[in-house]
């Protein structure tokens, strides 16, 4: 049995400005950093074997903030004095497994555009927007990869709003529009 803590990255500058980020790296704003720090505090005593993140920077940044207390505690147990002084973000990122399977949806020509100005009807979307079927395929591949790579482990994975909906859609065998949107830095638990 795998316990998966599925997390959405913290708020970014583009989230706050309602800009479609898609598969751009992104960077947390001050609110996003505070959100990730709050998750880190709440999850500090939880047992986590593996930290996984989308390979987009906003998720990696969120995951690094959440992982820090765990990695510092691990170093302290190994006898490293004042572990926090030695852990840079790069040190932490080296301990996080990254994957493109949980990248955000590829929004094609919509990437970088102001979200309220975009057409709502998918029939009016450009052909280069990633389909829901393709996203659900990536989501299924992600869940399969976790089962093979990390059986019987507790995993914290940081992804994005829509790919996290796709993961839950596959997991619960429900349509994506039946899955509630995750807030920035929200955590949901799935048992695989």
Range-by-range predicted roles:
Residues 174-192:
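Domain-level recognition of soluble alpha/beta enzyme cores
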Residues 53-54, 137, 158-159:
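Short beta-strand scaffold positions
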Residues 12, 163-164:
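Short active-site segment of divalent metal-dependent hydrolases/proteases
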Residues 4, 153-161:
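Generic beta-sheet signal
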Residues 2, 7, 11-87:
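Active-site-proximal alpha-helix that buttresses catalytic centers in soluble enzyme cores
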Residues 45-47, 146-153:
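Glycine-rich phosphate-binding loop signature in dinucleotide/nucleotide-binding domains
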Residues 16-19, 63, 108-112, 170:
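Short aromatic-enriched loop/helix-cap "lid" or pocket-rim segments at secondary-structure transitions
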Residues 27, 69-141, 180:
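Phosphate-handling substructures
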């Amino acid at each position: 049995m795998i316990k998966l803590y599925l997390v959405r990255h913290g708020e970014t500058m583009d989230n706050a400005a309602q800009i479609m980020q898609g598969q751009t790296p992104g960077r947390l704003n001050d609110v996003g950093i505070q959100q990730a720090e709050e998750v880190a505090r709440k999850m500090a005593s939880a047992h986590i074997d593996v930290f996984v993140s989308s390979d987009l920077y906003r998720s990696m940044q969120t995951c690094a903030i959440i992982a820090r207390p765990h990695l510092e505690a691990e170093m302290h147990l190994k006898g490293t004095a004042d572990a926090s002084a030695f852990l840079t973000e790069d040190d932490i990122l080296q301990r996080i497994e990254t994957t493109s399977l949980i990248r955000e949806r590829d929004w094609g020509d919509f990437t970088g555009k102001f979200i309220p100005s975009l057409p709502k009807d998918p029939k009016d979307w450009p052909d280069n927007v990633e389909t829901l079927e393709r996203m659900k395929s990536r989501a299924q591949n992600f869940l399969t990869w976790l089962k093979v790579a990390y059986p019987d482990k507790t995993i914290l994975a940081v992804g994005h709003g829509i790919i996290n909906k796709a993961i839950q859609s596959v997991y619960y065998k429900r349509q994506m529009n039946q899955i509630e949107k995750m807030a920035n830095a929200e955590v949901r638990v799935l048992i695989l």
